[in-house]
Each structure stands twice: as C-alpha cells, then as structure tokens.
Amino acid sequence: MNQITKISQITSGDVAEYLRLPEVTADDINTLNNLIGISKAFISNYTGRTLEELDNYQDFVIVSLVLCQDMWDNRTLYVDSSNLNNVIETILGMHSVNLLPQETS
C-alpha cells in the first residue's frame, strides 16, 4: 500500500488493497468511492472537524480504512456507531471538538 499521510489521499485502490480484494470491478470502485466519502463524513460529524481539517491528523487514515472495511464486510452504506471498534472510538474521541462548550459573545 502507498504511504498515505492525509485522509484526502485515500483512493479506491488503497481501500481495495486494504480489503485484500483479488479483483476490482467498476461497480466495486464506485462502491469503494462511496464508502470513502461516507467514512470521511462520519469522521467529520463525529469529531466536529471540517473535511479540510481531517487532513491534519494522520491517524484518521486508518480510521477511514477500518470504517470502509466494516461497511464493505457488512454490505452497508452507513457506519453503525453503536458498534464502533474501541480503538476507532478512542482515536475519534481524541480529536473531537464538538463536545466542548462554545464561547458566546
């Protein structure tokens, strides 16, 4: 697998390699691209970080790959947040800003 340092660098090929898919069809590529987008949106919503800010945290790369793997294995196009992997939940929690009270003027 290529050295990926930013979540925006993840491609369908990277996810296919992470999933150890022997052959990848055009439909698979489309599905993998959707899974990447869904994983990014989930990470952004969970942490309260913008999609642009996600690139500042290299550990979000593995989070995205694991989320894609879970969705691929379960054939779902959503992240089941009630059954998140503990490591993934910990990494996301370390970078969450939406749990902090907002300053008011």
Language model regions located:
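Divalent metal-cofactor coordination and adjacent catalytic microenvironments
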Residues: M1-S105
